[in-house]
Structure formats: C-alpha cells, structure tokens
A protein has these predicted regions:
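Transmembrane-helix motifs of polytopic, lipid-linked glycan transferases
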Residues: 91-112, 131, 148-155, 372-373
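Transmembrane-helix signature of polytopic, membrane-embedded enzymes
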Residues: 13-19, 104-128, 146-147, 161-166, ...
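Membrane-interface transmembrane helices that cradle and orient dolichyl/undecaprenyl
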Residues: 5, 52, 149-171, 178, ...
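Hydrophobic/aromatic-rich transmembrane helices and adjacent perimembrane loops
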Residues: 187, 255-269, 357-366, 383-432
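Hydrophobic, aromatic-rich transmembrane alpha-helices
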Residues: 196-197, 203, 215-218, 269-283, ...
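Membrane-proximal lumenal/periplasmic loop motifs of glycosylation machinery
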Residues: 30-40, 53-88
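Specific aromatic-rich, kink-prone transmembrane helix
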Residues: 103, 123, 143-175, 193, ...
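Aromatic- and kink-enriched transmembrane "portal" helix at the membrane-lumen/periplasm boundary
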Residues: 28-32, 60-61, 72, 86-90, ...
Length: 543
C-alpha cells in the first residue's frame, strides 16, 4: 500500500497544477483563434456532441465502425453548460492534452528524473505546430491515444515496482480504452512489449523457457507449437505478398490468392499471441498460482475498457479497415513522406503542408539530441520504451499501408509525446558531457519550436468564407443546402443546425441530414469557392 508523504504529495500537486496552467496559457492564443483551423471532421464531432444532448449515444464516429468517441460525451457536458461553439469544442481536447502532459510528467519523473521530466514537458508545451494542431483538434483520438498509452505504461511501471494489482488493472483498462479510441494504441502496445522484454532479468533464458515449454502439458505444447507454426507460415506468406505485390497459388486444386500482406500479418499476430499467451499463462501460474486471478482480472479490465466497441460490434457488426501496401508502394511513398510528412511532424511545414519559413539549419539540435539519446542507451541502462515508440511507429506506419497523402502524418502523431522525452534525454546526455552544450541544445530546441508556433500563428487567416456563406444563406432564407464535404458539416455546426448542409461528395456521415436536404428540391448547391457564390441561391444545380 502506498505510504503518504504530505510534503511530497503537496509538491507534486503544485507541479502538476503549474504544468496544466502552462499548457492552458500557452495554447490559449491558438484556442481563441480556433475557427481559423477548424474543419468539417471536427464539426462532425461537435454535431455528435449536440446530438448526445438530444438523446443520441454514439460509440463510433458517424459513418464508421471504428474510432471511438469518448470526447463527444465530454464535449456534450461542456455544451450543456457553456453552449456549443468552436472554442468550447476544442477546449475539451485541450483539457485532455493537459491531463496527458501531467501524466507523462509523472511517468518520466519515475523512470528518469525530475529534470528530464521538466524538459520533456517543455517540449510538449512549446512543441511544433503539428502537435499544437492535434492538441486542439476536436478529433481527439491522437491526444486520447497518448493519454491511454501513458496511463498504460505508468500502470505497468507502478505494478513492476510495487506489485500493485490496482495499477496493473488500470494499465489493462487503459489498453482496452485505447483500442476503442483508435488502433493507434498498437504503437504503445508494441513499444511496451519490447520494453518489458528489455526489463526482464535473464531475458534470454526466460524466452528459451517459453519456447521449450517443458512445464506445459505435452498436448498443449504440441497444440501451441502447431498454432505458432501456422503463425510463422502466415508471416512468410505475408512477406511474399509484400515483396511481390501478391500472387495466386493452387492448393489441392483450389486457387488461393496471396495478395494482402497486412491481413496475413494480422492473422499471424493473433495466432502468435494466442500460442505465446497460453504458454506464458501456464508457466507463470504454475510457479505463482495467485497470478491466475490477476490474469483474469486484467482480462476483465481490458474488456471493460473496450466494452463500448464490443457492444457496438455485437449489435451492428463491422470491423476496422486494414490498410494495404507492398514493397513497391512503400518505395513510392518514401519521397512524399520525406518531402511532406517529415517536415510537418518536425514543424517546418504547417499542418496544411505550407512551408513556415523557419531556417532548416535549426533542425540540427533536435537531430543531435535524438542521436545523443540513442547513444546514451549504451551507457546507461534506462528504460527505452520511448525510444522503441519513435522507432517502431514509423515502421508500422510504412508497412501497414497507412500512407495516403501528406495528411497521413496524423498517423505518426501518437509518437509526439515520446519524441519530446527522447529529445529531453538527448539534451540531458549532452549536458552530462558539457553543461554549456546541453543547455544550448535545450534552449535552441525551445527557440525552434517557438519560432515554428509563431510562424504558423501568423499564417492563420480568418475564416471569411464560412461566415459570408452563412450570412448569404440567412439573407436568402435558405435552411437546407448541399456542399462539398469539407464545407457541409462545418456550416451545419457553425449555424447550430439552424441551416442543414449535407455533403454531396465524400462520406455521408449522418444520412438524416441528406434525407432532409433531399426532401427540399429547391435546396441550392453551395459552390466550393466563395467567388462563385451568390447571396441569391442558384437552384439550377439542386439535388
């Protein structure tokens, strides 16, 4: 049981209060200009929150069978007290981000030191524009994934040090909750699994013990060996499909297509987890019978965290989509990734892909800090979970088929918190050799991120188009219209659903809007460009 230390607890509370206050104060200028980087995807979340107050209780984002939306319930509570607005909507994500920053501070302080925790926190607060954007986006999956992943890692660390079953159950519930929110949590699962293996004393002997499984009943040893063999076969087939782009084979006169590497690897991962999990469970419970109850409780906690998704799938079916990529596709993606995605994540391009004009030579301190942090792994046996995360995330991103265009950078954003820690560790490693160089690296990185934020803020222009269109629609007495996806839901939210604008392309996320628009044959179609729009509605292109 945890012993209470009132001075230490009071000091920690004050630290977290200061951190949360800094997050809110430094993000405030961007929050108050939130309409300048508010899009239709975010508007969907706001509309969902409004509908929660009307008795609708969604589990997933409208139009999807994945991407959980716990944030819309928080937004609904805010709307109930403060009314619906862009600022109110984005403030929910900001509050979740502040909680994440506080939680990661606690984790980093436990794993490393207070100094490193403060530096990592500074890099999160004064971070690149891509991080600022997602820390204020109503699509809160990035922030909630980082929050769930950090809670999972913190719970495992507390359990590892103290044996607290409550901490282990918290980690399990966070893992399930994160999976409901988004598949991004897999990044954290992989990194944590590698870190646990890294933590293990005599890990080579332990892994050999699991592979040999001499303590497992013979029938189960053979069964799990067959399952593991099947997993290996699927891995091989997936690799072949990935390298060749896919092919057909004939087995016993039946044509079999081997084309989707990612689907084959998913099957392999499931089989391998099943086989390894069975062996580990039996070996551990044989030596510690009480571990069985903890395993059952942890599984129950995971299910509880993932329960909304399980219930929705049980009622309506569906499954998350699986990306597809092969070696040729990955090779073709390298150039746009280096040209667009890397500069966006690093902060030299804005989230909308425009260059910010910040000198590229300022990238040198972060690069040196990352290298110093990686080299420090060989000199000091600290926990490499954050290093694993920034290495495995891009690899998974590449081979999973997640890349589509420059905006696919969002799939890399869950590693932003870990990157801040790696940069802090690098600055500290440099500081250990030269205080001047270490302090200089830290200051230069903060200056870089500050310049990037300032440049992006200067590029944010008022949303003149949306307000002008709304004024025109009001003057013309229009209450139903159609428009491009990226305009439709945004206008509907900004008008508080006084005007219903349904998309005539892209994803129809909420069919009742489209039904209401189609019920009015005179509903105009709003052109994509403001220069084409007249306050007198043109019904010639009505739906």
């Amino acid at each position: 049981m945890r012993s209470f230390n009132r001075p230490a607890d009071a000091r920690r509370f004050l630290q977290l209060f200061v951190i949360a206050a800094l997050v809110l104060v430094i993000r405030a200028p961007f929050l108050f200009q939130g309409e300048r980087f508010f899009d239709s995807d975010e508007a969907v979340e706001g509309l969902m929150a409004r509908h929660v107050l009307d008795g609708e209780f969604p589990v997933f984002l409208w139009g999807q069978r994945y991407k959980g939306v716990p944030e819309v319930y928080l937004a609904a509570a805010v709307f109930a007290g403060a009314g619906s607005s862009v600022i109110a909507l984005k403030s929910v994500t900001l509050a979740c981000f502040a909680l994440f920053v506080c939680l990661q501070f606690v984790l980093v302080a436990r794993l490393f030191s207070q100094a490193i925790a403060w530096m990592a926190t500074a890099f999160l607060i004064v971070g690149p524009p891509s991080l600022v954007f997602w820390s204020l986006s109503a699509n809160a999956e990035v922030v909630l994934t980082m929050l769930a992943g950090t809670a999972m890692c913190l719970g495992v660390d507390v359990w590892r040090r103290t044996g607290s079953q409550a901490a282990f159950l918290m980690a399990s519930a966070a893992a399930g909750f994160g999976l409901w929110v988004h598949q991004y949590i897999v990044y954290y699962w992989i990194a944590l699994a590698l870190a646990i293996v890294h933590w293990l004393p005599r890990r080579g002997a332990i892994l050999r013990h699991i592979v040999s499984a001499r303590e497992v009943p013979r029938w189960l040893r053979l069964t799990t060996a067959v399952v593991a063999g099947a997993a290996a076969a699927y891995v091989g087939l997936g690799f072949a499909a990935f390298v060749t782009g896919g092919f057909d084979v004939t087995v016993a006169g039946v044509a079999v297509g081997v084309r989707h590497a990612q689907k084959l690897w998913n099957i392999a991962a499931g089989l391998l987890l099943l086989a390894a999990g069975a062996r580990i469970y039996l070996i551990v419970t044989r030596h510690s019978p009480s571990s069985a109850s903890l395993a059952y409780a942890a599984a129950s906690a995971f299910v509880a965290g993932y329960a909304p998704a399980l219930a929705a799938h049980a009622v309506g079916g569906g499954a998350p989509p699986i990306g597809r990529a092969d070696l040729a596709g990955v090779g073709a993606a390298v150039s746009p990734i280096l040209r667009d995605i890397v500069p966006i994540v690093a902060g030299f391009k804005s989230p909308s892909t425009g260059w910010l004009g910040v000198p590229l030579w300022l990238a040198a301190p972060p690069v040196v800090a990352v290298c110093a942090s990686l080299l420090a792994l060989r000199e000091r046996p600290f926990t490499p979970v954050f290093h694993y995360l920034i290495v495995t995330t891009p690899v998974v991103f590449l081979v999973s088929g997640a890349f589509v265009d420059a905006q696919s950078y969002r799939y890399l954003m869950p590693m932003a918190g870990s990157l801040a820690v790696v940069l802090a560790l690098g600055a500290w490693a440099i500081f250990q050799r030269s205080r001047v160089a270490g302090a200089g690296a830290f200051v230069l990185m903060l200056a870089l991120f500050g310049l990037q934020q300032r440049a992006w803020y200067g590029q944010l222009s008022p949303d003149v188009q949306s307000r002008a269109i709304i004024t025109c629609l009001d003057q013309a007495g229009v209450r139903f219209a159609s428009a491009d996806y990226w305009l439709a839901y945004k206008l509907t939210f900004l008008t508080g659903e006084r005007i219903i604008v349904a998309p005539d392309n892209g994803v129809d996320r909420y069919p009742p809007y489209g039904d209401r628009v189609r019920a009015h044959p005179d509903a105009p179609r709003i052109p994509d460009k403001m220069t084409e729009f007249s306050c007198v509605p043109d019904t010639s292109s009505s739906r």
